[in-house]
Regions:
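Long, distal/terminal scaffolding or interaction modules
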Residues: 1-270
Length: 270
């Protein structure tokens, strides 16, 4: 078994500083001015490193980053990369994680998460905080727990997503999504879930003006719906009005508000 070459407290500049690096352990190193320092790298471990310029990890594979920092100009940092784990790190740069597969994020903050996690496949997130619009657009096969998100248009077009114990302050969340299940979470934002297919909310608190319209197959169980104007309505509702502690669901049949089946579980606050 080959021992990994180690770098300690380096200050690396210039384009492609460690291009096609393989079997490396890199400690407390600053990747300063210079694009694509680890492009096409393989089997890399990063500990306490800092990325200060663009495109650090493109077309890379088998990457582990712990206690690392992507500064604002480290934008578009991880694209077209497979099998990457980032833990206990801060990513200030926008447009990170694009068309990646097998992504694991644990205890990561994204203070500028605009256009982050686009078109990714196989994403696991635990204890992530993100602020920015269009988070996780068109990504699929995601398992997310304890995500706190401040940003609109999240999960647009996402497929096969499971969220647990999350807090989403997001207008237009889950638009055009498919096969999304949310457990024990708080969601606040207008127009939740429009044009989605197979959206399930279980044990959630939802505050959404005109939310959940034009949905095909909506399931809600043990949910609280707060401060709601006209929202999800469909043929499956059994009465014209179902009163809740926190609002009214208006069931107006044959108006095309929601498509096909909506299921309102008897235990829900609806």
């Amino acid at each position: 078994m080959n021992m990994k070459q180690e770098y300690h407290q380096e200050f690396l500049t210039g384009e492609r500083a460690l291009f096609q690096g393989k079997n490396l352990k890199i400690f407390d190193t600053i990747f300063d001015d210079g694009e694509s320092p680890l492009k096409e790298s393989r089997d890399i471990e990063l500990y306490g490193c800092m990325f200060k310029w663009k495109y650090p990890l493109w077309y890379a594979e088998n990457i582990t980053a712990k206690n690392c920092t992507w500064f604002e100009m480290g934008r578009a940092g991880v694209w077209y990369t497979r099998h990457i784990t980032v833990e206990d790190s801060a990513i200030e740069a926008p447009k990170n994680f694009r068309r990646c597969s097998d992504v694991t994020l644990k205890n990561v903050s994204f203070p500028n998460a605009a256009e982050t996690l686009w078109h990714c496949d196989g994403v696991s997130m635990e204890h992530v905080t993100a602020k920015g619009d269009y988070f996780a657009m068109n990504s699929q096969n995601m398992k997310v727990s304890n995500l706190t998100l401040y940003g609109n248009y999240s999960f647009d077009g996402a497929k096969n997503v499971e969220l647990r114990d999350c807090r989403l302050l997001s207008k237009d969340a889950f638009w055009n999504s498919e096969n999304v299940t949310v457990y024990d979470s708080f969601i606040s934002g207008e127009y939740l879930g429009w044009n989605a297919k197979n959206l399930t909310l279980i044990g959630c608190t939802v505050e959404s003006l005109q939310g959940m319209c034009y949905i095909e197959n909506l399931v809600m169980k043990n949910c609280k719906l707060l401060n709601r104007d006209c929202s999800a309505t469909c043929e499956a509702l059994q009465s014209e009005h179902k009163r809740a502690r926190y609002g009214i669901i208006h069931a107006r049949k044959n108006e095309g508000i929601a498509r096909k089946a909506c299921i309102w579980d008897g235990g829900a606050d609806v």
